[in-house]
From Swiss-Prot:
Stored Pfam families: TCP
Record's protein name: Transcription factor TCP10
GO molecular function, one term: DNA-binding transcription factor activity
Alphabetic keyword roster: Developmental protein, DNA-binding, Nucleus, Transcription, Transcription regulation
Annotated stretches, region: Disordered: 220-259, 295-317
Coiled-coil residue spans: none
Keyword match Transcription: yes
Residue intervals of the TCP domain: 29-87
Assembly information from the UniProt record: Interacts with AHP1, AHP2 and AHP3. Interacts with SPL.
GO cellular component terms, semicolon-separated: nucleus
Length: 361
């Protein structure tokens, strides 16, 4: 241990290099003002102890028989060397950092289904296939039976009434998203009333499926498609008997035959009643179908009404199968001899006025 003298301040002094640091020993001044160099900078040589610690230290010094406190401190440090070394080792161990092994294995996507208090939360992985992602929207419990089969039970979905369920086989066009129906309006300048009452709602569902019907048989009544010539002949016969007919444009007769609107039993009494001899002249307009509507005079005696009411009611009986309003619209069909069943073949009274010409919407 060497000594090197340096002048420190005006009073001078020297720095004594000792084990564990340096001691600044002041010269020309009292020793209590000396400082020591430590790892955290110069500190006072003298250590101020609390009263309780000073009592215990002097008790140790007295037991050791030392006359100087520094000797008692050296003995304590020597006895505590093992503990001090452990503290130094402990400091080195605490400073060392342990690196945890990094798991580079990619995790497989997981699906979590949770349902609490009727609130369902689903977590779907972003890297799923479209088919797998579709399955995640339906929480299912899969059970395997003894035969190797798999049973999938769908749960936690509200059940709707079967009566309110409507099967949609085809997607309707955007302009037919509402309920389909015929809106009958008299032509401008015509003050005559409409035969059909306003309280009846002509609505129907699944209009697109009517075009697929190829034939319709009801009891002894058989209806098949006819040619264009037969259709024109039928129109002339219907004009003499009266009724309502919904037709396509004439140049489409060879492609699309006529379509007839069947009314329910309540509308039959108004339509076939001989007491209400109401006339409808003009053009019936429709806001949904590009068809031309014809109207002609309706004259029927009470005797003819009672004579042919049974035959007409048998044909209209099936209209209750297609809704509460009893309306059935058949496309792609022609109904030969229909007006004969409605008004009878022996109607002999001539019409008071001729039918108006066809008008296209």
């Amino acid at each position: 241990m060497g000594l090197k003298g340096y002048s420190v301040g005006e009073g001078g002094g020297e720095i004594v290099e000792v084990q564990g640091g340096h001691i600044i020993r002041a010269t020309g001044r009292k020793d209590r003002h000396s400082k020591v160099f430590t790892s955290k900078g110069p500190r006072d040589r003298r250590v101020r102890l609390s009263a309780h610690t000073a009592i215990q230290f002097y008790d140790v010094q007295d037991r050791l028989g030392y006359d100087r406190p520094s000797k008692a401190v050296d003995w304590l440090i020597k006895k505590a060397k093992t503990a001090i070394d452990k503290l130094e080792l402990g400091e080195t161990t605490t400073t060392t950092t342990r690196q945890e092994p990094v798991n580079t294995k990619p995790e497989s996507p997981t699906l979590v289904f949770q349902r609490e208090n009727n609130d369902q939360t689903q977590f779907v992985a972003a890297n799923l296939d479209p088919e797998d992602a579709m399955k995640t929207f339906f929480p299912a419990t899969t059970t395997t039976n003894g035969g190797g089969g798999t049973n999938i039970n769908f749960q936690n979905y509200p059940h709707q009434d079967d009566n309110n369920m409507v099967s949609r086989t085809t997607t309707p066009p955007p302009n037919l998203s509402q309920d389909l129906g015929l809106s009958l309006h008299p032509f401008q300048g015509n003050n005559n009333t409409v035969v059909v009452p306003e309280t009846n709602n002509f609505t129907t569902t699944h209009f697109d499926t009517f075009g697929r019907i190829s034939g319709w048989n009801h009891h002894d009544l058989t209806m098949t498609s006819s040619s264009s010539s037969e259709h024109q002949q039928q129109e002339q016969e219907e004009r003499s008997n009266g009724g309502f007919m919904v037709n396509h444009h004439p140049h489409h007769h060879h492609h699309q035959p006529s379509m007839m609107t069947l009314l329910n039993s309540q509308q039959q009494q108004v339509f076939l009643g001989g007491q209400q001899q109401q006339q409808q002249r003009g053009t019936l307009q429709s806001s949904l179908f590009p068809h031309s509507f014809r109207s002609w005079d309706h004259h029927q005696t009470t005797s003819d009404h009672h004579h042919h009411q049974n035959q007409a009611s048998s044909m209209f009986a099936s209209s209750s199968q297609y809704g509460s309003h009893g309306m059935m619209m058949m496309q792609g069909l022609s109904f030969p001899n229909t007006t004969r069943l409605l008004h009878g073949e022996e109607a002999t009274q001539p019409n008071s006025s001729s039918s108006p010409p066809n008008s296209h919407l």
